[in-house]
Amino acid sequence: MVQLDVEKTIEELTLGEKVALTAGIDFWHTAAVPRLNIPSLRMSDGPNGVRGTRFFNGVPAACFPCATALGATWDTKLLYEVGRLMGEESIAKGAHVVLGPTINTQRSPLGGRGFESFAEDGVLSGILAGHYCKGLQETGVAATLKHFVCNDQEHERLAVDSIVTMRAMREIYLLPFQLAMRICKTACVMTAYNKVNGTHVSENKQIITDILRKEWGWDGLVMSDWFGTYSTCDAINAGLDLEMPGPTRWRGTALAHAVSSNKAFEFVMDERVRNILNLHNFVEPLGIPENAPEKALNRPEDQALLRRAAAESVVLIKNQDNILPLKKEKPILVIGPNAKTAAYCGGGSASLDAYYTVTPFEGVAAQSQGEVTFSQGVYSYKELPLLGPLLKTDDGKKGFKFRVYNEPPSEPNRQLIDELHLESSSGFLMDYKHPKIKTFTFYVDMEGYFTPEEDGIYDFGVTVVGTGKLFVDDELVVDNSKNQRQGTAMFGNATVEEKGSKELKAGQTYKVVLQFGTAPTSDLDMRGVVIFGPGGFRFGAARRVSQEELISKAAELASQTSQVVIFAGLTSEWETEGYDRDHMDLPPGSDEMISRVLDANPDTVVVIQSGTPVTMPWAHKAKALLQAWFGGNECGNGIADVLYGNVNPAAKLPLSFPVRLQDNPSYLNFRSERGRVLYGEDIYVGYRYYEKVDLAPLFPFGHGLSYTTFSRSDLSLATTPEKPQLEDGEPITVTVSVTNTGSVAGAEIVQLWVAPPPTGVNRPVRELKGFTKVFLQPGETKKVEIVVEKKLATSWWDEQREKWASEKGTYEVLVTGTGDEVLKSSFEVEKTRYWLGL
């Protein structure tokens, strides 16, 4: 790669070459123009790790804690480090652009991708995203803020019209993008799938050009979300530089014709191409060649960072009687469906093949010096657990053979064209290629051998984008090849899981074969704009058991053990791109199991893993409760570090946890109704709503405990004289002394809130405006400083003037942290002023 003379290159490009540059050539790469030294660039997801170019059988990658976990750290320095490692992982995968971070707003606990965004509050989300992007882009890799804007649900996400007031859009949904860009002007922005107030964002000139480019002065590249382009002229004229993925659906000859007929002017094309070429120059110093090989890093220092991030994200919600930290020398009983499951990431674009994973059970067992006992408690899978890791090949290797043919099994003389060895029995074949396969229609036989450890009836399940028949010792057990039903897996393209059962004997080996036909062999009506090539498969199995039997056994064991910890929650099956949750509840049986174990042993520690809030009807019984999120590669070690006191928890909730779903402000206005969703709660998202109506959530935004105690004192506040025009340069500086009054070293998160004066418009009771994190030894005192611009601390969006309004009056400053102590001060705004810009 070489630095391009952008203006000269634009002059030398033909119209056809310009058109080609504005669309991808495949799922991850942009077009090249070799004669002008314009190479193809590679992009890669994304939200919590750099997957590379392959969903199927790809190169493993580092998996970071999910965004809500990182949001819980409230730690800008950590987010910067995470961003740098993300950049280094991207370079290892030969990718010039990372498709992240996601900074949408969790207006509902049910959003399928809620775990991908940092927080319900724009200040927390935007500041963390800015430091993450700063770290990432300092490696030379381009960051992509997404999904711009109001992409806050999965239901009908390609078509839904988000009806939102401009005030709410500015104060809630655009704010994290605005604040992130004040810290780091990212190289890229990705548009949302949805419409906003009647127009798809990818062709919404007001959002892309008027606000993003003109008002905020941003000059990077705007790309569509994958298959999120819906027009030729409207999108190009609105400011959408790049349609992804390729091959193009809307550009190509259609765009060339539009330019020749002045539906889109060539000078507009030049603007689009200019932004694409500027991106080339931004990433050129990386020196990543076209089609670079993908490598794994997995360095010890990276593992240490991932472990620290996992531990620092764990929120200590309750700790009555100082049950925590646990004693390493004492025996411990580990219970629950998440104990031996590595719930390390959510589903969809966030999913990847991690270098390794550590389950909570493994993390606890590695640190305990006493006996570690396990009880299942309950099973919480949505689909049957993957069978692949339990299989052996005919030559004794873990996993199964994956044999590819161009002809179906009914063809007696078909020729084997490819054979792979796989361990995961879930595969998305969108990027599988072989030179002898010319179409999306081909067939795969997957064969392995299963030796059960227990007698019993075993249930087998098959989910496909395509067709599938599962045989056990040549007996057809599951037929998912006809009368198929649409399900939610694999971005909503797959069937529901079809099941069958067979009685098996312990110690006996059975041959298991899945005969799979790719997507074109399915009889489902697969209408929709997103088509993922050959499709995919998933097959699982489990011994049929009684949940009541499991719960009773767990409760009995808990009554006999002094140290007990439950690991429960959700997994990537329950929280994933492609669909929203129907409710906030834990999987069936989990609440009953937790409640009965707590009755048997009230000192039981409960650890919940989920990316977004869940109901906890047993919370009043729990003396010790932690929220542990999806913690990445090192989730099990990170949780164990907190349980045993190696790490003193400091995390705070980045989301409000309502008592019940009906309490959340979007309850009446979530999901699409006849093609639209009304953002009826307006600016009252999350804590803004609960505080305004004086409704206590189960656990509030910003809550989190520590193994030590802190005090805050000596609050001082300094402002600068007001200028005629409100702009940057009028900082409010808040200084406070923080003391560790306990006996354990730990970190405190100091939160700065501002409460507005009474005005003629409804405003929240208070809003978060800044925060900082400080580490203190026992007895140590440090002064911390939080600086926020007056315009950001005081303003609301005036829809009549179409400007931010900073109204005169007395503004109260509140400083909070761990515990109930609140320090207060105030400052004056002498004159009402209005402003626009970043």
Curated annotation (Swiss-Prot):
Glycosylation sites: N197, N493
GO cellular component assignments: extracellular region
BP GO terms, sorted: cellulose catabolic process; glucan catabolic process
Class of enzymatic activity (EC top level): hydrolase
InterPro entries recorded: Cellulose_deg_GH3, Fn3-like, Glyco_hydro_3_AS, Glyco_hydro_3_C, Glyco_hydro_3_C_sf, Glyco_hydro_3_N, Glyco_hydro_3_N_sf, Glycoside_hydrolase_SF
Enzyme Commission number(s) from the entry: 3.2.1.21
SUPFAM superfamilies: (Trans)glycosidases (SSF51445), Beta-D-glucan exohydrolase, C-terminal domain (SSF52279)
Domain PA14: 395-555
PROSITE patterns: GLYCOSYL_HYDROL_F3, PA14
Task of the protein: Beta-glucosidases are one of a number of cellulolytic enzymes involved in the degradation of cellulosic biomass. Catalyzes the last step releasing glucose from the inhibitory cellobiose.
Protein name: Probable beta-glucosidase I
Organism placement in taxonomy: Eukaryota, Fungi, Dikarya, Ascomycota, Pezizomycotina
Underlying gene: bglI
